[in-house]
Amino acid sequence: MTQGVEFNRLMMDMRAMKAEAMSTPKTTAAPELAPGQSSFADMLGQAIGKVHETQQASSQLANAFEIGKSGVDLTDVMIASQKASVSFQALTQVRNKLVQAYQDIMQMPV
């Protein structure tokens, strides 16, 4: 008789868990940001924009040097080129980390 009671109790517990799981929302909304805060997407977009600006400035400086514009030194061109290169490499590493994090999350068991 105790097996029947334990089984009934187990079934009641399972039904209660099922009802609780069905009543909770499947997805949660993103938290609201306080005024003055920026989201990760905004910060990433700003970083991409800065890398683009650095590359554009480097390219313009190199073009100015190539056509012989006065006031443009080779050292300035090389420094701008290296800054653009380093910023692009950093952005590439951030992208690689994001892709790896996404893949790790997708491979997690449910």
From Swiss-Prot:
One Pfam family in the UniProt entry: FliE
Sorted UniProt keywords: Bacterial flagellum
Compartments where located: Bacterial flagellum basal body
SS bond partners: none
Cited InterPro entries: FliE (IPR001624)
Record-level GO cellular component terms: bacterial-type flagellum basal body
Keyword Ubl conjugation on entry: no
Family: Belongs to the FliE family.
Protein name as catalogued: Flagellar hook-basal body complex protein FliE
Native source species: Pseudomonas entomophila (strain L48)
